[in-house]
């Protein structure tokens, strides 16, 4: 791996992935809303920021997202669901990453191996949903998973050595998760980044369109 592009590179996990890659000697390009004005809810800003880059990148990581929808905590009951929170979650956690992918595709090599990794969440798995709750966030992440799965199918026709996957990083110690970790084991962002990169290092085109956790175990859709 020689060149990597990290979207969401000032967030806890995105920054840790970028730092870990740089420590390996990879040439890392970092882009984010706070540093570069890349707003995943604004396609014009996505197009402008990514359109200014010159590829190809061996690795593109989309590490954007949020838990709170329209300023509300994740719902514990159906009665707490609002249209505003649902729409906000889909804008940030599904539509935004897909638009980033759309404008990032020209930055992937067509004749060489590459990985496009999008951070998802285990709670977006329909098959693994046993306790309910977090309705807006779950639904948005499930939609993201479907979008990436479909994109991987299309990508296989044009970039035969590419691998596009969704990755669950675990519960990472960041401001993003601080209020919701509860009894779940949390890991520091550098450890989470190392875990994810260990998975990314082993990916092949045959695994494209799938959903993996930080240990490389496949998660059901």
Annotate the PLM regions.
Residues 7-20:
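N-terminal Rossmann NAD(P)H-binding glycine-rich loop of SDR-like oxidoreductase domains
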Residues 19, 98, 142-153, 190-197:
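Conserved active-site helix of classical SDR/Rossmann-fold NAD(P)-dependent CH-OH oxidoreductases
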Residues 31-48:
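Rossmann-fold cofactor-recognition segment
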Residues 51-70:
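A glycine-rich helix->loop->beta "capping" turn
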Residues 61, 69, 117, 164-167, ...:
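Hydrophobic structural elements of the Rossmann-like NAD(P)H-binding subdomain
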Residues 66, 70, 74-90, 110-158:
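Catalytic loop of short-chain dehydrogenase/reductase
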Residues 162, 166, 174, 181-221:
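C-terminal helical subdomain
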